[in-house]
Amino acid sequence: DNTGKICDSLYVYSTSDNSWSAVQTDQQRPKGMYRTACCRMEDQAFLIGGRRGNELIDEVWTYEPSAFVWSKKSNFPIKQYGGISVVIGDRIYAGLGIINKADPSLEYTTQFWSTDKNAVAWEKEASFPGRMLLCAIAYGNYVYGVDGDGYIWRYDPDSQNWSQKSQLPAANRSVHCMYVLDNYIYIGLGNASNSLISYDPTWDN
């Protein structure tokens, strides 16, 4: 929060009246954490890894909004914060987070895993061959991400293969967000740019 304390509150946003309100959840919710990799599968939100102050965590939690219930799952294979988590079909793909505490020499893992909605066991996927992946999304049956040098990467879960694609323009290589809308991937709004660019994967062969 604005005092520097790690917050354990949860809020819901209403698109109808542009407002935030606190969610009353059960007492089994996790302790406050940040830089957690998050995704949604079916009717549950998944929170993977993160930090509590100087502590890196490997916890995996789910939150079910319809029942206001938190559930703790099996731990993630490593302690990390940041990283990515996306859903393709009936699998969650996660990893590639930061595994040390020191700034500015942050160390990113190249390891990548997947699990099903029960999150009982994590299966190893192909390691990422590039430099730190800043963000990623699921598009079609692939994972698309942008690395620290502005290159777009595509991961094919079926073949377990990473392939390097185009490099973003120099002015757009500082990436804050990445999302899909109307069959385009939008990338940008980093600390060096206030613009978004659109990327069409069908152009980039």
PLM features: what roles do these ranges have?
Residues 1-205:
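Kelch-like beta-propeller repeat domains
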